[in-house]
Amino acid sequence: MKKKVRVIPRTSWAATSLWTAQYKTISILLFALSILGIGDGLIVLSGLGSTPWTVLSQGIAIQTNFDIGWSSFLISCAVMLVWKPLKLRLGLGTLLNIIVIALFLGITTKILAPPTALFSRMIFCLIGILLYGFGTALYLTCHLGAGPRDGLMVGICQRFHLSINVVRSSLEISVCLLGFLLGGVVGLGTVLFATSIGSVVQFFLNIIARLPHIPYEK
C-alpha cells in the first residue's frame, strides 16, 4: 500500500483541535499571520500590481458595480462553498486569518512610505512575496484551520494528491487570467506573485518539514 504524503507537515507545535491550542501554537500562528500581512503590505506598497485574487475582485467589481471589498467577500464565500466536498472545516486559524492579516496589512501600508525608484519597488515586491510565502507555510503548520483560499489549496492537494507548488501556482495563474479577462489590472508584481508564490510556500514547508524535531512522511 502506498504511503500517504502529508500536504502540511505535523509539527511539534501543531494543535490537536481546530478550536483549542496551547500558548506556543497561538503565538506561532499570530506571528506567522502578522508576517503574511506585512508581506502583503510590501507588495501593495511596491505599486507593481495587486495579488491575483485582488485582480479578480477588481474584475468582478467592474462587471457588477459592486465595491471591491464586497467582491472580495463574495469570492471568499464562493470559495468556502467548495470546502464541504473537500471535507474542510473552519478553525480558529480561519478567523484569525481574516483579522490579523488585514490588521498588519493596514499597519504596514501606513507606517512605510511607498518607494519611488523601480529597483526599490522590485525589492519591496520580492521581499513581500518571500514574507507572504513564509507566513503562509508557517501558519498552516499550526493546523488550526486555513483561510478561505488557502483552505481551497490544501483541500485540492489532499483530494487529488498534488503538491502545494502545483496547486497554488495553478490557482493563482487561473485566478489572475480570469480577473484580467473581467477587466482587473495586472502588473509585473501580479505576474511575479502568481508564478512564484506556489514554489515559495512549498520551499518553506519543505524546510519546516525537515527540522529535526518534526516527524515527516515522504
From Swiss-Prot:
Q: Does this entry carry the keyword Transcription?
A: no
Upper classification of the source organism reads: Bacteria, Pseudomonadati, Pseudomonadota, Gammaproteobacteria, Pasteurellales
Transmembrane stretches in the record are 28-48, 66-86, 92-112, 122-142, 173-193
Protein known as: Uncharacterized protein HI_0522
* Any one GO CC term of the record: plasma membrane
Q: Where in the cell is it found?
A: Cell membrane
Could you tell me the superkingdom of the organism this chain comes from?
A: Bacteria
Key words, A-Z: Cell membrane, Membrane, Transmembrane, Transmembrane helix
What membrane topology term does the record carry?
Multi-pass membrane protein
Q: Which InterPro entries match?
A: YczE/YyaS-like
Chief localization class?
membrane
Position of the signal peptide: none
